[in-house]
Regions:
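Disorder-to-helix initiation segments
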Residues: 1-16, 93
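Helix-loop segments that flank and shape redox-cofactor active sites
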Residues: 2-8, 23-48, 110-125
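Acidic/histidine-rich alpha-helical segments that form the ligand environment
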Residues: 12, 58, 62, 81-132
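Alpha-helix capping/hinge segments and adjacent helical runs
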Residues: 19, 65-73, 103-106, 110
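Conserved alpha-helical segments that form or flank metal/cofactor-binding pockets of metalloenzymes
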Residues: 38-77
Length: 141
């Protein structure tokens, strides 16, 4: 089956949404489970990250609905779409930081691609939102 531009655009948006949710969950997981000498600083940083990311998820869902798209809304769908690897273990604090840095860079790239597609589609309001999400991830990468 061949996809048209809208299909690719819509799939990219859903992938970004699922990846953003997975990223927020990972940051929250690390916030809850961080241990070690830098616990206070990392506990606070991870909370800041997941709050910054999670704050945009509802708006992102509303943006998708404005395009008449249904948002992925189950862990099964998230796992099928996300580009952020799940973390089933509790890594050491250095690995937590490294993972979130790498994932934040990945998310900035995902949002950049979606931004460009939104601009090409004339969805300038959504493009602005996606640029803001990209900036948040650049801050943490």
């Amino acid at each position: 089956m061949e996809f048209n531009m809208n299909d690719k655009y819509h799939l990219s948006l859903k992938t970004a949404f699922a990846s953003e949710y997975a990223f927020a969950l990972k940051a929250q997981n690390f916030h809850w489970n961080v241990e070690g000498a830098s616990f206070p600083q990392l506990h606070k940083l991870f909370e800041e990250i997941y709050n910054a990311v999670y704050d945009g998820i509802d708006t992102f869902a509303e943006q998708l609905r404005a395009l008449q798209l249904y948002t992925p809304a189950s862990f099964e769908k998230f796992s099928m779409l996300t580009k952020v690897a799940d973390e089933n273990e509790v890594p050491d604090q250095g690995s937590m930081v490294a993972e979130l840095l790498q994932d934040s860079e990945k998310m900035a790239g995902i949002f950049k691609i979606c931004y460009e597609m939104a601009e090409q589609s004339g969805d300038h309001g959504l493009a602005n939102f996606l640029a803001e999400r990209q900036d948040i991830h650049k801050k943490y990468s």
